[in-house]
């Protein structure tokens, strides 16, 4: 598995409730751009329309060696999942306070581009502060243990 991009901010801003791996409908120049790791998914989110999932604001840069038939960087892309997974995710989108965001884009062992999406719930400010304190304490603990050895 070759990781192309990771949305680390999503793990900080949200509680991850459930994760899914999905395929994406892409054109050739988008795949080539993904191989060059020219993707930004900081503002990306998933919406449901007609029992299909669509990812919005996923910026895949134009492939620089492509001709004039290049793709649009911010076009809406369809996600490919099983029907029961789509029903489950669509039901969670309608629940107040829950959202679906991308966590990671990767190429699987067969070389197919996949995206890991998650059903998330937003963190409050005090939850974010608690996460920072925990992370700092773990870092300090590892420094202390290295000094003692």
Swiss-Prot record:
SUPFAM superfamilies reported for this sequence: Small protein B (SmpB)
Domain of life from the UniProt record: Bacteria
Keyword Isomerase in annotation: no
Pfam families: SmpB
A cellular component annotation (GO) from this entry: cytosol
Protein location: Cytoplasm
A molecular function GO annotation: RNA binding
Keyword Transcription regulation appears in the UniProt entry: no
Record-linked NCBIfam families: PRK05422.1, smpB
Cysteine-cysteine disulfides: none
First-listed, main subcellular location of the protein, grouped into a coarse class: cytoplasm
Organismal lineage: Bacteria, Pseudomonadati, Pseudomonadota, Alphaproteobacteria, Rickettsiales
Keywords: Cytoplasm, RNA-binding
Protein name: SsrA-binding protein
Role, per record: Required for rescue of stalled ribosomes mediated by trans-translation. Binds to transfer-messenger RNA (tmRNA), required for stable association of tmRNA with ribosomes. tmRNA and SmpB together mimic tRNA shape, replacing the anticodon stem-loop with SmpB. tmRNA is encoded by the ssrA gene; the 2 termini fold to resemble tRNA(Ala) and it encodes a 'tag peptide', a short internal open reading frame. During trans-translation Ala-aminoacylated tmRNA acts like a tRNA, entering the A-site of stalled ribosomes, displacing the stalled mRNA.
Transmembrane segments: none
PROSITE patterns in the record: SSRP (PS01317)
A single BP term in Gene Ontology: trans-translation
Family: Belongs to the SmpB family.
């Amino acid at each position: 598995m070759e990781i192309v991009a990771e949305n680390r901010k999503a793990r900080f801003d949200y509680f991850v409730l459930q994760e899914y791996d999905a395929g994406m409908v892409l054109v050739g120049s988008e795949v080539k751009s993904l191989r060059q790791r020219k993707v930004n998914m900081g503002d990306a989110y998933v919406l449901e329309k007609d029992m299909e999932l669509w990812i919005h604001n996923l910026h895949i840069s134009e492939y620089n060696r492509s001709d004039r038939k290049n793709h649009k960087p911010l076009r809406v892309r369809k996600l490919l999942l099983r029907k029961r997974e789509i029903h489950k995710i669509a039901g969670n989108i309608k629940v107040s306070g829950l959202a679906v965001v991308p966590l990671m884009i990767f190429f699987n062992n067969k070389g197919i581009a996949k995206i890991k999406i998650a059903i998330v719930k937003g963190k409050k400010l005090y939850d974010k502060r608690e996460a920072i304190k925990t992370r700092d304490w773990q870092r300090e603990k590892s420094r202390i243990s290295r000094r003692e050895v």
